[in-house]
């Protein structure tokens, strides 16, 4: 095996022999003591051999196994600095193994801390160390100045993908922001995502999913989030229904906020039954969005508050409220015969009824609150008209009081 591994570095090619040699759970074949002449490669070989032995003795990840896996990645980083693009996938395999070990160890530490009723100060330790090592791999790829097509720059996407996962588990949102800014600043030097991952479609899907989730939930850039999430959905294999559901959990609200697209009925119907209290189900929210039922919307938002906050979806879904209010105002306008003048008190009464509040509660304050909501709709361009505060009347355009903002279907 050692000879096959050294030949990979000699002839600049990635083979299954090298990938199996990197894997801690694969047995060593041959003499590990037959070190190659290159000092860096020899250190990598010895570290990997020690990792395999320790992994077999521990029968899985352990703190010592993690230390050796971390040393393995650092050793391969030093080698990769002078190699071309062929080394990206072996380096990614090594880094992915480290991330998986760190996540498993931190989860085990967290469970032990909960059982002992201790604090959780040490639960991020392995992932934090892991993140620093993987970030070094990312920098290696970004700093590759080789003009040839065989450079390592496409590897930046591979390690960004691992860092997305690592930072998500750590809750390190600022580190995600910094990483995305660096990738965007180097966009001209990097190949397109689809070309970078090649035939590894699963990696393309995961990368697009994380980037779309970041732009939608952390930056409130729904158009950019929609493009990445939609690419993830279209690239995902049609039989991977669980992945489809995970992507659609973000794409359904983002598609509406970005393009004003409702989800198709079969998309909502395909959602699993709502027995799981931690699951996110959109049937009621879509019904509220179509009917202008603010009360139903508020109840659903409260019911799903914790899972929405965990997934970062609370802010995007809270941005749906103006559209539901717009539906309500439009319904009042139709019931009033399509008049160009709508008394504020009628809209306030409909608003109070929809939210199960007492219609006359607050009196003038309720009317003032309703005017503020209507002024917001006018400022956003959702309603063409103006407010007559003295007469407490909403005056709307006779030709097009409510510009068409919503399409009936989505491409999802």
From Swiss-Prot:
Alphabetized UniProt keyword annotations: Cytoplasm, Nucleus, Signalosome
- What range(s) does the PCI domain occupy? 220-401
Q: Which GO terms describe its cellular component?
A: COP9 signalosome; cytoplasm; euchromatin
One Pfam assignment:
PCI
A molecular function (GO) term: RNA binding
Give the protein's function.
Component of the COP9 signalosome (CSN) complex that acts as an regulator of the ubiquitin (Ubl) conjugation pathway by mediating the deneddylation of the cullin subunit of SCF-type E3 ubiquitin-protein ligase complexes. The CSN complex is involved in the regulation of the mating pheromone response.
Q: Assembly and interactions?
A: Component of a COP9 signalosome-like (CSN) complex.
So what family is this one in? Belongs to the CSN12 family.
How is this protein named in the record? COP9 signalosome complex subunit 12
**Organism, scientific name:** Eremothecium gossypii (strain ATCC 10895 / CBS 109.51 / FGSC 9923 / NRRL Y-1056)
The organism that produces this protein has a lineage beginning with: Eukaryota, Fungi, Dikarya, Ascomycota, Saccharomycotina
């Amino acid at each position: 095996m050692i000879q096959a591994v050294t030949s990979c570095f000699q002839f600049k090619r990635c083979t299954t022999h090298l990938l199996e040699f990197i894997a801690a759970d694969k047995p060593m074949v041959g003499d590990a003591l037959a070190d190659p002449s290159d000092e860096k490669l020899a250190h990598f070989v010895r570290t990997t051999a020690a990792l395999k032995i320790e992994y077999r003795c521990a029968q899985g990840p352990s703190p010592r196994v993690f230390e050796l896996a971390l040393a393995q990645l650092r050793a391969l980083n030093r080698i990769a600095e002078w190699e071309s693009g062929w080394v990206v996938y072996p380096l990614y395999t090594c880094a992915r193994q480290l991330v998986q070990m760190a996540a498993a160890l931190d989860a085990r530490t967290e469970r032990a801390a909960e059982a002992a009723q201790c604090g959780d100060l040490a639960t991020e330790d392995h992932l934090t160390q892991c993140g620093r090592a993987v970030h070094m791999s990312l920098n290696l790829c970004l700093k590759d100045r080789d003009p040839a097509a065989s450079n390592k720059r496409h590897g930046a996407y591979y390690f960004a993908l691992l860092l997305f996962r690592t930072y998500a588990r750590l809750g390190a949102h600022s580190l995600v922001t910094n990483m995305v800014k660096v990738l965007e600043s180097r966009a001209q030097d990097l190949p397109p995502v689809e070309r970078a991952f090649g035939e590894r479609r699963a990696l393309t899907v995961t990368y697009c999913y994380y980037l779309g989730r970041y732009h939608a939930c952390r930056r409130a850039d729904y158009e950019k989030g929609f493009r990445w999430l939609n690419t993830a959905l279209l690239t995902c294999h049609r039989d991977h229904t669980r992945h489809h559901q995970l992507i659609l959990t973000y794409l359904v609200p983002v598609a509406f906020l970005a393009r004003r697209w409702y989800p198709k009925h079969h998309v909502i119907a395909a959602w699993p039954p709502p027995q799981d209290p931690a699951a996110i189900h959109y049937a009621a929210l879509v019904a509220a969005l179509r009917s202008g039922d603010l009360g139903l919307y508020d109840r659903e938002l409260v019911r799903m508050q914790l899972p929405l906050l965990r997934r970062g979806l609370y802010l995007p879904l809270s941005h749906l409220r103006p559209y539901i209010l717009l539906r309500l105002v439009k319904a009042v306008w139709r019931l009033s015969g399509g008049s160009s003048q709508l008394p504020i008190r009628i809209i306030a009464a409909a608003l109070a009824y929809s939210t199960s509040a007492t219609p006359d509660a607050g009196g003038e304050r309720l009317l003032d609150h309703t005017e503020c909501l209507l002024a917001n709709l006018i400022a956003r361009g959702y309603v063409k008209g103006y407010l007559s505060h003295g007469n407490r009347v909403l005056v709307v355009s006779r030709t097009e009081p409510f510009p068409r903002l919503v399409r009936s279907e989505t491409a999802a």
